[in-house]
Amino acid sequence: VLNAGDKANVKAVWNKVAAHVEEYGAETLERMFTVYPQTKTYFPHFDLHHGSAQIRTHGKKVLTALGEAVNHIDDLASALSKLSDIHAQTLRVDPVNFKFLNHCFLVVVAIHQPSVLTPEVHVSLDKFLSAVGTVLTSKYR
């Protein structure tokens, strides 16, 4: 459960990330595809090479959705309901992939915003990303 301090920490990190959603999103996906190559199976139609327009576009889409979650941090279930439906019922993404994505995003934030990602902020961001993953997998059967 996110407490008031966690929410403030997540919003503070997001203020630094928001201006870089395409760059950080693409880097997060590229890192995930490299470290967890099995995740590529969900993107058979994508050019998965470094810097591809499709990865940049999808990375931006992923982090824009994450930004919406930050903006609705007190009601993640409503904010992510449509995404949860799509990932569970249409795309049928294995829930473990959200953990992979979350880990890769944390690494990207640590690389680009090391002064912001204190141990306390790291914990808050990890809790937030876990909460997002829980909501996104809530409609799986």
Swiss-Prot record:
Any one Gene Ontology MF annotation carried by this entry is: oxygen carrier activity
Q: Which SUPFAM superfamilies match?
A: Globin-like
Annotated residues for binding of heme b: H87
- Globin domain location: 1-141
* Binding residue positions for O2: H58
Reported tissue expression: Red blood cells.
Pfam families, per this entry?
Globin (PF00042)
The record's Gene Ontology biological-process terms are: hydrogen peroxide catabolic process
Q: Does the keyword tRNA processing apply?
A: no
Q: Which GO terms describe its cellular component?
A: blood microparticle; haptoglobin-hemoglobin complex; hemoglobin complex
Keyword tags: Heme, Iron, Metal-binding, Oxygen transport, Transport
InterPro entries reported in the protein's UniProt record: Globin (IPR000971), Globin-like_sf (IPR009050), Globin/Proto (IPR012292), Hemoglobin_a-typ (IPR002338), Hemoglobin_oxygen_transport (IPR050056), Hemoglobin_pi (IPR002339)
In which family does this protein belong, per the annotation? Belongs to the globin family.
Q: What does this protein do?
A: Involved in oxygen transport from the lung to the various peripheral tissues.
- Subunit structure and binding partners: Heterotetramer of two alpha chains and two beta chains.
Please state what the protein is called: Hemoglobin subunit alpha-A
Its source organism is Chrysemys picta bellii (Western painted turtle)
Annotated gene: HBAA
